[in-house]
Amino acid sequence: MRMFISMAISFYTSRIVLQALGVSDYGIYNLVGGIVVLANMLTSSLSGATSRYITYSLGEKDFEKTRRTFSTALMIHVGLAGLFIFVAETVGLWFVNTQLVISPDRMLAANWVYQSAIISTALGITQVPYNSLITSHERFGVFAVIEILSSCLKLIIAFIILYSMLDHLILYSILYMVISVCIIVFYRIYCLRNFSESRFIRILDRDLLPKLLKFSGWTLLGNVSLTVLQQGVNIIVNLFFGTIINAAVGIATQVQGMLYSFIGNITTAFTPQIIKGYVESDYKRMNYLITIGGKFSSICILLISIPIIIKMDFLMGLWLKEIPTGAIVICQILLIKNFFNSFNPLIYTAITATGNIKNANIFCGLEYLLSVGITYLIVFWTHSYIYAFIFNLITSLIACGIYLWALKHEISSFSVYDYVVHTILAVTLLGCVSFGTAFFTERLIQSDIWSFFAISFISTTLIIILSFYFVLDSNSRSFIVLKVNSYLHYGHK
């Protein structure tokens, strides 16, 4: 329920923001301020790396070691934030002011957006150890509260800029930054009050430091490369098509992110258990968690995405007063990409648990960087942004293959064949059958609203039934039956 409330607020906020900024300014914000979204992805990945070592020390019940681990990680991330600021204020600032296709009269506003994004991102990087501590203690409820609070605050600033007499783009970027800072402050206060190991000490764990630096370095390589790919596609679109298509990308990316967040809770819940499985050398349980987590994540994406993909034009029309050119088709492609991306997080979590992340990050990093050049050539030859996003979808499939290879290299008991056949192909076939049935149903009903409800009901029913009998294993089926019976029994009391 919390996710639906947060998503509903976020969708309505996007409508108000687009109305207040206009398509062109919204495109500028997505292009220049997009660094915030990508940096959030980067800090989430760094958080996973830091969580590994904190979870290890918590498992050993060594308070002093946990405190040294936290303080060492915090110092590393402060250094990374400083490095980020240096690069952003030199190379990044030059690129924004000389290379991007932005109207001269909006360049001042673009710089305000850029500087606000730098502040939010730098503080977000230093926040990583605190979020890792919350995750390692499995206090997921605090994330839920903050997510809803953040959504409400963003809705408030959307209305503020709608009726403000000031420059809407500048005001929006500043207020968005203020919200980010407030959330960071809240998390830190929460950690200081609940986890005594979060109190910083000026002691570097010299045994842990090289391990953390090495681990964070490889993580940084892979995720900086992914960030370069995501923002690179946005920049390429800007160079060829201008800020109007950037607005479409911004809308599509926001929908993609909001729907993908549904599996975030699944990934977060499985992560500590997978790491603990590796620590205890319980590889059978670890492999089971990777498999069942991948199934639940991908099935969840199908349940949400199929009706939206089929009725995207209708839903966009209800949502936005003005639909940016290209937003519908880009959004449909990105939602399909979400499905294939849903397999990757837990596979990478397992690789992270082993500590040997070098191969996965080197090869994925090379793939992502190479993909930027290929994307440029595709757009240059075809003069179509659609093919760029289709190719971007393919990179997710390649990355999944690299992660599976890397995991098999570290854990020989993990069966790539079983995972591909019984998880990826099984759920993909389930998705194709459900999508085909829903698409055929949509053709039979003329009314948009009734066809949306019909395909939602049919696809959901079909996915649940087929998943239960043909995708999930007997243990998972028994667990679900037990939970349903328990819920029904409780409901009749």
Task: Indicate where each model-derived feature is located.
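Interfacial/gating helices of multi-pass transporter permease domains
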Residues: I16-L38, T69, L169-I174, L208-S216, ...
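Helix-loop junctions and terminal segments of transmembrane helices
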Residues: S44-E60, S136, F195-S196, A252, ...
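Transmembrane helical elements of multi-pass membrane transporters/channels
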Residues: M1-F11, L175-C191, R206-K276, F296, ...
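Signature of the first transmembrane helix
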Residues: M1-Y56, I85-E89, S120, L155, ...
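Interhelical loop/hinge segments that connect adjacent transmembrane helices in multipass membrane
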Residues: L169-S173, Y187-Q230, Q273, S281-Y288, ...
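Membrane-interface junctions at transmembrane-helix termini in multi-pass inner-membrane proteins
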Residues: I119-L149, F159, Q332-E367, T382
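Membrane-interface helix-loop junctions in multi-pass transport and translocation proteins
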Residues: L18-A20, S24-D25, E138-G141, L149-V185, ...
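Membrane-proximal transmembrane or re-entrant/amphipathic helices at the cytosolic face
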Residues: F414-V416, F435-K493
